[in-house]
């Protein structure tokens, strides 16, 4: 039995989908369930192992579509500059280095090699470019050996990619990809040819030899959904819903507009064993919508995309009147609204302090607002920090995001006993905040009148302290958090997998 989790790409700045997958990979390791995480995008800018290891995958859990047909394993880069130069004859004249880029020149020949290093302080090469008479002719990509080459031809003074070759460990070519205007058109093996990426993905899916003891979990489907659906019918198929799944504004009594990332999956819900959402509230909404707008009544299970190992008490005591938020400092997080609300509430509660954790593009705007209101003494930007032991030093958590599919920081905050104040929006806030019990849900409207928002948040901050309900709310936060303990989520996954495989 193997659980195959299918995604497209991964990068250094991963999205919530990759973090959810990495968390799931850890769950499957703890449950001793055999699992593979499949990435189907062409990923060459970095060795994929560096990206997957960075977020928490084990190498043996990762399958990359393009080297699956070779015997090369997922492994960190260990090829050196000297190893690279062995692929390229000629007598070296000199080298030029700029950060992670090393250029090697040769005597009496109009050619040079540019090595792109893993780290400017290490001699390890991720990929190399070979230039001859001013033209880029080849790029090689390395992990513990060369795994791919790209070939270029000059056209209108531009290097045009016309072929990729993937190798076995011993350097023998396994297959070529013939390119046309940057698009993969033909996959040429010694004994077979595939036309187009869908045919290539289908061959990959067939090579897994799926059966009813296997589970395929589809995280993203763009460009591959139909093939995965068709080939996964010999196994069990689950689909993860990672975001808001429909457009509220374009939905009426007779018609629903699904999020286009889920349209194919929902339209073909009869081919799916079960859907996975991360909150009970989204589960309820989706069940109602399937019943109302479709002929399908699929199984939908709620499994959170994160958990907390234990509840965290305040060992050093909490700082009185202390507020905290933690997120990317991005426009959609609306930290500026929180800053203005705290400035307003501070007029009534002068002991208030507000610490903001995270970094991002709104940093300078927030500093400007704080400075303009002479609020530096009680509102501070703290940058990045390991927050697990920090939440419990504070009394209240604030969030102004108008869309939070789950909200890992909200979960972590209640796990440290913090009451929360946030908008009454799906799905994270409605999951972690029980209005009046462990915080407050503030009504949200689409026009977002800033002054009204500021006043509403300030009023709730003051109400929380003036009604002297901190202790009761703290206890209720801990109570909600118990449902998100790691042991609970492990049990949910265990039960879900057992049910589907013994169905």
From Swiss-Prot:
InterPro entries from the UniProt entry: GtfA, GtfA_EBD
Keyword Nucleotide-binding: yes
Keywords, comma-separated and alphabetical: Cell membrane, Cytoplasm, Glycosyltransferase, Membrane, Nucleotide-binding, Transferase
Subcellular location: Cytoplasm; Cell membrane
UniProt effect for mutating residue 333 to A: Loss of N-acetylglucosaminyl transferase activity
E.C. number: 2.4.1.-
Pfam families hit by this protein: Glyco_trans_1_4, GtfA_EBD
Principal localisation: cytoplasm
Chain residue ranges for the region called C-terminus R-fold-1: 196-306
Region listing for N-terminus R-fold-1, in residue ranges: 1-78
Enzyme class: transferase
Membrane topology type: Peripheral membrane protein
BP terms from Gene Ontology: protein O-linked glycosylation via serine
GO cellular component entries: cytoplasm; plasma membrane; protein N-acetylglucosaminyltransferase complex
Effect of residue 332 to A: Loss of N-acetylglucosaminyl transferase activity, nearly wild-type binding of PsrP
Binding site for N-acetyl-D-glucosamine: 242, 332, 404-407
HAMAP family, per database record: GtfA (MF_01472)
Misc note: Encoded in RD10, a pathogenicity island with an atypical GC content that is associated with invasive pneumococcal disease. Pathogenicity islands account for greater than half the genomic diversity observed between isolates. The main function of this island seems to be correct synthesis and export of pneumococcal serine-rich repeat protein PsrP.
Subunit details: Monomer. Interacts with stabilizing protein GtfB, probably as a heterotetramer with 2 subunits each of GtfA and GtfB, part of the accessory SecA2/SecY2 protein translocation apparatus.
Protein name per Swiss-Prot or TrEMBL: UDP-N-acetylglucosamine--peptide N-acetylglucosaminyltransferase GtfA subunit
Species this chain originates from: Streptococcus pneumoniae serotype 4 (strain ATCC BAA-334 / TIGR4)
